[in-house]
Amino acid sequence: MATTVTCTRFTDEYQLYEDIGKGAFSVVRRCVKLCTGHEYAAKIINTKKLSARDHQKLEREARICRLLKHSNIVRLHDSISEEGFHYLVFDLVTGGELFEDIVAREYYSEADASHCIQQILEAVLHCHQMGVVHRDLKPENLLLASKCKGAAVKLADFGLAIEVQGDQQAWFGFAGTPGYLSPEVLRKEAYGKPVDIWACGVILYILLVGYPPFWDEDQHKLYQQIKAGAYDFPSPEWDTVTPEAKNLINQMLTINPAKRITAHEALKHPWVCQRSTVASMMHRQETVECLKKFNARRKLKGAILTTMLATRNFSVGRQTTAPATMSTAASGTTMGLVEQAKSLLNKKADGVKPQTNSTKNSSAITSPKGSLPPAALEPQTTVIHNPVDGIKESSDSTNTTIEDEDAKARKQEIIKTTEQLIEAVNNGDFEAYAKICDPGLTSFEPEALGNLVEGMDFHRFYFENLLAKNSKPIHTTILNPHVHVIGEDAACIAYIRLTQYIDGQGRPRTSQSEETRVWHRRDGKWQNVHFHCSGAPVAPLQ
């Protein structure tokens, strides 16, 4: 009988101590390596709760962190899998967040902001040279190595980072934190390294005045501002900022990513590399005051989300079941925090300047209709009823990372592509249908009497002899569609399908089938490679 050997290397080599941070599926604890006595931070991921896709993301994060060795990046020292848990052993950084340190300083000037952004840009440049795009640059991920004066800035959290080849631009999914997202990501266009520079521009703007360039409580309006590049330098606070600093911000917040300054170029900007003569040395007390309010607002919103996670097992981009034993006291805490948030968020003076030239709110409505009825009698109208794959959004939270928007977008893509396939069937358009299907499409369907059918000829028969000639009204309702994303280029959709139609005697009929379609993406296009349909044959086999 074979014996399963369970790895216990982390347990054997490290001693765990107090918690120093928490996430939706992980906790960070201080640890000590027993043989050396050196302190580290262990990110402990509960792998029992992870999906296959989450496992892929974890492997990607570890792979990326192993690549990066720079004085301004939190370094990964070890990556260990044990039964039920994965341990990522990082530098222990004890200086806290950069933004929290700034507000505690007695003196803070433009030159200090220049030194901060220089270190951030050095970290970003190293990432880009190693073919890594961080995708989630924001204040929460900018830490200080220690409490000592002049401690190095450290870039942390590569959970959303991706690997790219050179200056490759592609659609890597909708991911990041709302206030720091670039226009190209919001437009769902191909993107790459320039997204990190855009986020650096937002961070630099905040470093100089203590509030962000783009702001609106309505996330849609916020996104409209970002896509339009609608920011300005209002008086009086910007009057004391040097033109060179504003110039660098403008080059970072350039809408066209091809024209946006690179990390290498930004480090050569006079305001960065010649700060002693170019950047102002004047103390910026108003910036410090605004930054205190900005920090307080970030922390409160973080507390609200953490409480929601605790009380509802809820995270951005995921929908899970709340524990049955949740206390009403915890629920009350959530409501109390929400009320505090409303009070704080309604005060424009609290670290957020109102926009003077924000764009008009224009609504773009996408219909998440999915539709997959039986092969013989496809509907003219399709409806999704009770779509269980609808993913909950968080409450207004511009500092909350959107972790699974890419998966959500892919699910909607699958539904939309399936709808296009059904549209082709509805129209009796075999040519359009064939473009969406793999030439070697396989299927199990009632019409094939339990046999596996391969290729398009079997389906062509129904197009030419039934579908193209059908003129009677048909209505389909799709019940409880589930989309399973399988890696980057595969997905499966399953659903119950009700089809209403008029039979040959003019009587209304309803048929039900349970169906599954498997999709594979090739050359950027989804193709149906297999489907399985249960039930009785819809078309009369005579």
From Swiss-Prot:
InterPro entries: Ca/CaM-dep_prot_kinase-assoc (IPR013543), Kinase-like_dom_sf (IPR011009), NTF2-like_dom_sf (IPR032710), Prot_kinase_dom (IPR000719), Protein_kinase_ATP_BS (IPR017441), Ser/Thr_kinase_AS (IPR008271). Residues 349-376 are annotated as: Disordered. Keywords: ATP-binding, Calmodulin-binding, Cytoplasm, Cytoskeleton, Differentiation, Kinase, Membrane, Neurogenesis, Nucleotide-binding, Phosphoprotein, Sarcoplasmic reticulum, Serine/threonine-protein kinase, Synapse, Transferase. The modification Phosphotyrosine is found at residue 17. It is found in: Cytoplasm, Cytoskeleton; Cytoplasm, Cytoskeleton, Microtubule organizing center, Centrosome; Sarcoplasmic reticulum membrane; Synapse. Residues 14-272 form the Protein kinase domain. The modification Phosphoserine is found at residues 367, 371, 394, 397. The active site is at residue 136. It comes from the Eukaryota. Residues 283-292 are annotated as: Autoinhibitory domain. Gene3D superfamilies: 3.10.450.50, 6.10.140.620, Phosphorylase Kinase, domain 1, Transferase(Phosphotransferase) domain 1. Its main location: cytoplasm. GO terms for biological process: activation of meiosis involved in egg activation; apoptotic signaling pathway; calcium ion transport; cell differentiation; G1/S transition of mitotic cell cycle; long-term synaptic potentiation; nervous system development; neuromuscular process controlling balance. Its EC number is 2.7.11.17. Residues 291-301 are annotated as: Calmodulin-binding. Autophosphorylation of Thr-287 following activation by Ca(2+)/calmodulin. Phosphorylation of Thr-287 locks the kinase into an activated state. The modification Phosphothreonine is found at residues 287, 306-307, 400-401. Pfam families: CaMKII_AD, Pkinase. The CAMK2 protein kinases contain a unique C-terminal subunit association domain responsible for oligomerization. Belongs to the protein kinase superfamily. CAMK Ser/Thr protein kinase family. CaMK subfamily. Calcium/calmodulin-dependent protein kinase that functions autonomously after Ca(2+)/calmodulin-binding and autophosphorylation, and is involved in dendritic spine and synapse formation, neuronal plasticity and regulation of sarcoplasmic reticulum Ca(2+) transport in skeletal muscle. In neurons, plays an essential structural role in the reorganization of the actin cytoskeleton during plasticity by binding and bundling actin filaments in a kinase-independent manner. This is Calcium/calmodulin-dependent protein kinase type II subunit beta. The gene is Camk2b.
